[in-house]
Each structure stands twice: as C-alpha cells, then as structure tokens.
C-alpha cells in the first residue's frame, strides 16, 4: 500500500471484454481471475494441450487453438474485436512482439489496450516500440493480480487477512466523490469498514463520518472478499 477472459463477436462493432494470448501458467491465472470477476474472456494459444488444461478451470470458457502470430487467425478468432488484449506468452520473444504489433496495428483492429509480458529489459523495450501500452514481468506480478487490476482499475493494493477477509486500498470511485462517509454509509450499503481516507501520504485513520471524499484520494476499507469486490470500480 501507499505507506501499507465458440467466440461470437458482432461484426462491425467493437466490444468490451478481454482476450488473453498464451495460456501458460501466467495467462491461465489472468483468465481465472477475469472469469471469477464475471468478465467476458476469449483465450487463444498455439497449443491444444494448453487450451485443454485451461478448460479444466472453466469448461465453458471461450478458448481456441490459434496461430498467435498470424493476423488473419487472430482476426477470425475475434481477438481484434476486443478492447483489451493481454499478450501473456513470453517465448519465443518474436511471437510476443508479433502478436503485440498485430493487435495494435492490424487494419480494422478495435483493440484499445495491449498489456504484454516480458522476460527482460530488452524484451520490454521491443514490446514498447511496437506499441504495447503496458509491459509486465511475471517475476514481479502474478497473473491473478493483473486480472484483478483489469477488472478493478482503481484497486491499488490488497492485504489478505484470511481466506474470507481482507483490506484494500482503492482510489475513490467517481460515484463517491463529493460525498461524506456519513452519506455513503459503506458499512450498511457495502458491508465494509472504512479504516482510512484522504490524500496520498496524508491519510486520516478512523476518519470521522463528516469526511468528504475528493477525486484522486484514497480509501482503505476492510471486509469480506465478496463485499470488497462489490465496491464500484469507476
């Protein structure tokens, strides 16, 4: 803390949702977290074995065996119709670079954001050069954490208390801005307890009910995982 995704895309219409290219350990973790959050997910991989293993997580998941370096194959699968693509494969390096380039620059692509996995600083720079909007290192970020960030962009950090409960630090959602804690009554409406609120590096712990939340400020809340995930993300 700060001080603590058979595809049925509609032709001609860009869609929300996520595509995950490469479903090894990292990609599968991303898919699992997205599915758990109820997100629309399309998974593709060169390997039938990888796709079969992914279906053990959720037999209903939309997953296809696709040449991930072939523009027309990715287009036919529906990957280029989704807003966010996670290029989760890292080897061979040329494959991840090619997939990233296709998603960003292919004619008619509707992809708005590509998050690519890198294995080295050089790999990172090459991915950025072909248009990756964000590059992550598996050694520094778990797939599950990336999945959570994708569906809850205002989640900054989470602390596990036990299997059922935790503490999260989030950016104040727009729907909370300008409202007091008394008005929001998060304990009643969301079953969470507010531990702290305020500006970055200037949090007020156990804030009074009169505290009015501002744009860009932070909120630290405690509750069950189910309750925390029900908080608005935007």
Where do the PLM segments sit?
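Cytosolic regulatory regions of ion transport systems
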Residues: 1-234
């Amino acid at each position: 803390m700060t001080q603590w995704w058979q595809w049925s895309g509609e032709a001609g219409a860009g869609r929300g949702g996520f595509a995950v290219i490469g479903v090894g350990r990292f990609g599968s973790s991303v898919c699992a977290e997205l599915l758990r959050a109820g997100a629309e997910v399309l998974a593709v991989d060169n390997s039938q074995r990888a796709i079969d293993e992914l279906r053990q997580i959720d037999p209903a998941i939309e997953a296809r065996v696709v040449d991930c370096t072939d523009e027309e194959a990715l287009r036919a699968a529906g990957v280029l119709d989704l807003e966010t693509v996670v290029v989760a494969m890292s080897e061979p390096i040329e494959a991840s670079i090619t997939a990233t380039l296709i998603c960003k620059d292919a004619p008619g692509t509707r992809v708005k954001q590509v998050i690519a996995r890198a294995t080295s600083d050089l790999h990172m720079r090459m991915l950025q050069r072909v248009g990756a909007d964000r590059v992550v290192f598996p050694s520094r970020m778990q797939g599950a954490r990336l999945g959570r960030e994708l569906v809850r962009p205002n989640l900054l950090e989470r602390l596990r208390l036990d299997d059922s409960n935790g503490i999260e630090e989030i950016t104040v959602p727009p729907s909370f801005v300008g409202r007091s804690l008394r008005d929001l009554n998060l304990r009643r409406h969301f079953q969470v307890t507010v531990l702290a609120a305020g500006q970055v590096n200037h949090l007020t712990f156990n804030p009074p009910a009169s505290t009015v939340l501002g744009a860009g400020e932070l909120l630290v809340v405690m509750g069950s995982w189910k309750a925390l995930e029900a908080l608005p993300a935007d």
